[in-house]
Amino acid sequence: MQEQYNPQDLEQKIQKHWDDNKTFVVTEDANKEKFYCLSMFPYPSGRLHMGHVRNYTIGDVVSRYQRLQGKNVMQPIGWDAFGLPAENAAVKNKTAPAPWTYENIEYMKNQLKLLGFGYDWNREFATCTPEYYRWEQEFFTKLYNKGLVYKKTSSVNWCPNDQTVLANEQVEDGCCWRCDTPVEQKKIPQWFIKITEYAQELLDDLDNLDGWPEMVKTMQRNWIGRSEGVELSFAVNGETSPLEVYTTRPDTLMGVTYVGIAAGHPLAEKASQNNPELAAFVEECRNTKVAEAELATMEKKGMDTGLRAIHPLNGREVPVFVANFVLMDYGTGAVMAVPAHDQRDFEFATKYGLDIIPVIKPEDGSDLDVSEAAYTEKGVLFDSGEFDGLAFQEAFDAIAAKLEAEGKGKKTVNFRLRDWGVSRQRYWGAPIPMVTTEDGEVHPVPADQLPVILPEDVVMDGVTSPIKADKEWAKTTFNGEPALRETDTFDTFMESSWYYARYCSPQADDILDPEKANYWLPVDQYIGGIEHACMHLLYSRFFHKLLRDAGYVTSDEPFKQLLCQGMVLADAFYYTNDKGGKEWVAPTDVTIERDGKGRIEKAIDDQGREVEHSGMIKMSKSKNNGIDPQEMVDKYGADTVRLFMMFASPADMTLEWQESGVEGANRFLKRVWKLVHEHTNKGTTEALDTSSLTGDQKALRRDVHKTIAKVSDDIGRRQTFNTAIAAIMELMNKLNKAPQESAQDRALLDEALKAVVAMLYPMTPHASFAMWEALGESDLDSATWPTFDENALVEDEKTIVVMINGKLRAKLVVAADATEEHVRELGLKDENAMKFLDGLTIRKVIYVPGKLLNIVAN
């Protein structure tokens, strides 16, 4: 091996070896245990960022570790290639989304290869190709025929600038999260898939996902939002249809003083027809739709419709208000309001001078006071007629029974989860395979006419989707009759909901080859950001159950283990421009002065301007604080970047990018390289004779095997990769100081270095591959992970600490099996101990076996 560690030449050579030998290409093998490791595939935005590098490094470390465990490891990669950024880039660059996307894929593919990730490139695909989305289209038509797909007109958040529908969570302060344009409400027909039919199963099966972070499971439970309650009817004066409401607190029914309805509720629309003031308020509510998460903090507003609802049990009339906090998407779009026992209702009632009637008091008999705030705990009913004195569950059951007997309500289970709206009014997505004939009937496109191909040679004007603008494209036939194609495209979550399964058989002449899919699935380890907890991860679980029920897969869940990696942070700097706005400056263009504690005192950019330090924040284009992985690989090599990524922080925590840390990782790799070079340069070593080792040699070998045990557990079970690397570094410090005089010294070092190189392989595969060969071994890619020798861990001797009156006074080295009596005797005779015991009377001697001798004397 070369004396100097030169990653640039080395890495290229080894990557070529992997390519030439198809090292990571796998097929099904019934005789081998499989391991399917998958990192969430990238959107081809143009360049990899450090978030990508972290995600894919973790995946590669897990894959290579499992490979050395002797498993048949599949690690595929592909491209989540549809989506709005491609359209925006196409408009900006006066091109079509397709060529922009394919160029980016080519560039990013080369970047991934330079980082040395062990992918099976034979399985690569891009979701924007007809070969991929054709099967998605066919599966959608099968779901339609099963009654799991429907079309309905629904009110959507519409961004007039992007000309697209936004999910509730993409609306921030009433504006589009992407371009900050005020969002409008618009009613359009859309396609939905009935995820609600699977709500209970999606909820129940979370209990079986032992390998998932609790936080993600909790987020999904809350998103699905199962509740048990009562659906009841309030008659409305002058209306034929009653007002349906759902409540989880029927025990508070006698405290209802008004009913709130959503601005989109039919009653609100009807009431506003002859009431211009109400009509204006309804319009205001519709156009300031907010994410559900913001409901709690926003100002509560309402307006009396003039309608009166009749209480179903006591007949009292209560006003019906349009309220901005009632969402049409959730429940029935109407709520019964009990100001005495719900804080939101309380604030609203106080603001509009509505009655507040308490009907629940504390179970312990303490005083009830609802003058300042609602009493929201469960308690005992009073002023509730026949239900007085009942506790929550008794009251729940009794009131539900009475409502049911009178035909005014029933117990029901409700889910917060809504059906999945999969229509998007964009061009760059998979066409929805439906047609409408002249008689208005809607039909799925027959399988033999699929795929419905998205034309790629288009001109983007930035306003209208080319397939909506091109009237000819929509014209088709169905059973010989003229028909019009659907011009909406699928939500891009459709493609990412089943891509993991397509990797199992990417060339299959169907959505999946069941035999291959059932060999590989479920995914053993999935890696990606926690921001996908409620959308992508839930949709993928749903899609997997659809594939199961269609007979393609036998498992219930797609991902056994889930690791959510933390974000990558970097220093961010800015100066204030003439207009008072922030201009962000790249950290690489900033010179920093630090104080004695390492804190930034002053920062000057390359134009000589003093800039403000905004702290360590997520790397992003908008803050100009991204670090280009390419530059780091060119400067230090891929192995160094990978090692830093895995060492700088626990995988699930944020990682603070510090180039000094990258330099540290590089120095460490050079030290390992240097020691291997020095060792191998002295020629071959003789076999290690473990029976003739000296005490020091045994101690060093014990450290080697303790490290193997720890690293194996840290990578394989705990996934604390940073502590695994720290343990290897600690061992290297000892190996650097170890004597190399005798043949057995060198034989022991040989065993130790082979273990170090193999343990570093998942993180630094190129350097490890070369050092492994230099150590006289062949093909590290198919080697076996080092195993620790139980006998080496057995200690012949132990160090016992001697404490006198709580202070450390001596250390004893004794045989590992020394008796308490022997240790006491040695401790009391120890020279140091005797010095401190001189003239004192020993009152007590406490022995903690194998660790401590504590002497109390005065």
From Swiss-Prot:
What class does this enzyme belong to in the EC scheme?
ligase
GO CC, sorted alphabetically, is: cytosol
- The entry marks the following residues as binding ATP, namely 621
Which InterPro entries would you find in this protein's record? aa-tRNA-synth_I_CS, aa-tRNA-synth_Ia, Leu-tRNA-ligase, Leu_tRNA-synth_edit, M/V/L/I-tRNA-synth_anticd-bd, Methionyl/Leucyl_tRNA_Synth, Rossmann-like_a/b/a_fold, tRNAsynth_Ia_anticodon-bd
Q: Where in the cell is it found?
A: Cytoplasm
Q: Which reaction does it catalyse?
A: tRNA(Leu) + L-leucine + ATP = L-leucyl-tRNA(Leu) + AMP + diphosphate
State the PANTHER family in the record.
LEUCINE--TRNA LIGASE, MITOCHONDRIAL (PTHR43740:SF2), LEUCYL-TRNA SYNTHETASE (PTHR43740)
Q: What is the protein name for this chain?
A: Leucine--tRNA ligase
Look up and give the organism this protein is from: Aliivibrio fischeri (strain ATCC 700601 / ES114) (Vibrio fischeri)
- List the top taxonomic levels of the source: Bacteria, Pseudomonadati, Pseudomonadota, Gammaproteobacteria, Vibrionales
